[in-house]
Regions:
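C-terminal motif of bacterial Sec signal peptides marking the signal peptidase cleavage site
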Residues: 15-17
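An active-site-proximal structural segment forming one wall of the substrate-binding cleft
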Residues: 59, 95, 102-111, 130-159, ...
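Aromatic-rich peripheral "rim/lid" segments of glycoside hydrolase catalytic domains that contact
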Residues: 56, 325-383
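Acidic/histidine-rich helix-loop elements
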Residues: 81-97, 121-131, 265-294
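N-terminal carbohydrate-binding accessory modules
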Residues: 29, 35-114, 129-130, 305, ...
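Bacterial signal peptide processing site
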Residues: 19-21
Length: 383
């Protein structure tokens, strides 16, 4: 399995560092040709100090790059570890990441975990904007557990609310945070993907977000020249936001993503954080002809955008809040997932164990009706 190969490489590195004799390294993978487009120059950023080594080191250049279209398919069926590390403080929203969650989601049949992270709450507010070592260690642990359980892992930056309100005041800090993240994880296997920002909005319109994405991509590429990075549109990362965007440059290691919560009055009925959503309570989704046609139309538009921009497209979030009736949630989830898959789109469900959850962390039981339309049992047991 992939995880065993990675652990073997990591163990070899540790043994060598301790002075023991290690096997001769395998031939290094052939480097890819230079990127088709010249990346913009890396901004002058405040110096920060990398204070601690990774607990699971990998040698530089140990892994061959993965084609973006290939990796988009490898993401398969994923789940978001939402309401955990993107809370102001882990546990504040009722959930923490637990070790048993990783084998649990893998054994259920998921291929990927997307990990929303509020990095901005765990770093200095002033230069050099250093990320707290103990928080980095927590993310190290998450990544290590994902890889050990043969899961792809998408690391993002979530709920950077200050950036959405004050782009110029937060631009430098945003770039320095990603400089630290990218540098720390530069030698990890390609199954670790970077998603620079979740749901750009507010001060980030299409034009300003495209400019900022190019800047952060240049920062990442200094240490991760071939890691796949995930691009999204503005307008909260919606499909409409993606459709209004264009491929940022000719970098071959880019995937595109969008989030799908339509019809919004159905998926967010009764959501406490959405003003007026209580008026939508009782909205159902039974999959009539018009409802199915709307989903098909949207998925066709996502695929068309990908072809026009020569980028693989990944649906990074979709789900319906638990205030909707279960039959409607099951019908909607099933149809959206199957419509995406029929067009070659992979996805990650929002989310694991909270208000949209496919798992109940209190009863320690899966929400079987939702799980069974996300991943059929015969597929899960055959893995």
């Amino acid at each position: 399995m992939r995880k065993l190969a990675y652990l073997a490489i990591a163990c070899t590195t540790v043994i060598t560092a301790c002075g023991a004799e290690a096997p001769q390294p395998s031939p290094q993978p052939t480097a890819e040709p230079p990127l088709a487009a010249t990346a913009p120059p890396r901004p002058n950023l405040p110096n920060w100090k990398e204070e601690m080594p990774l607990p699971f080191p990998f040698p530089e250049g140990a892994f061959a790059p993965v084609d973006a279209f290939v990796q988009a398919q490898q993401l398969g069926r994923g789940v978001n570890f939402g309401n955990m590390l993107e809370a102001p403080k882990e546990g504040e929203w009722g959930l923490v990441v637990r070790e048993e969650y990783f084998p649990l989601v893998r054994q259920a049949g998921f291929d990927t975990v997307r990990v929303p992270i509020r990095w901005s709450a765990h770093a200095l507010r002033q230069p050099p904007y250093t990320i707290a070592p103990e928080f980095f260690q927590r993310i190290d642990w998450v990544i290590e557990n994902a890889l050990q359980n043969d899961l792809n892992v998408v690391i993002n930056m979530h709920h950077y609310e200050e950036l959405f309100k004050d782009l110029e005041g937060e631009r430098e800090r945003f770039l320095v945070l990603w400089d630290q993240i990218a540098t720390r994880y530069r030698n990890l296997p390609p199954e670790v993907l970077f998603e620079p920002l979740n749901e750009p909005h507010g001060a980030l319109d299409n034009e300003s977000w495209e400019e900022l994405f190019k800047q952060v991509l240049a920062v990442i590429r200094r240490t991760n020249p071939h890691r796949n990075v995930i691009f999204t549109g503005a307008d909260m990362g919606t499909l409409n936001g993606l459709l209004q965007a264009k491929r940022p440059n000719d970098d071959p290691h880019l995937l595109a993503t969008f989030h799908y919560y339509l019809p919004f009055a159905f998926t967010h009925q009764g959501a406490e954080w959405v003003e007026g959503s209580s008026a939508w309570l009782g909205t159902s989704w039974r999959g009539n002809g018009t409802q199915r046609a709307n989903v098909d139309y949207d998925m066709d538009r996502a695929v068309r955008w990908g072809k026009q921009n020569n980028m693989p497209v990944w649906m990074g979030e979709f789900g319906a809040y638990s205030k909707a009736d279960l039959d409607s949630r099951v019908a909607w989830t099933n149809y959206v997932a199957r419509a995406a898959e029929a067009r070659g789109l992979t996805w990650a469900y929002w989310e694991f164990g909270s208000g949209f959850g496919v798992y109940d962390p209190i009863s320690l039981q899966w929400n079987e009706p939702i799980l069974n339309v996300l991943i059929q049992k015969q597929e899960a047991t055959g893995r």
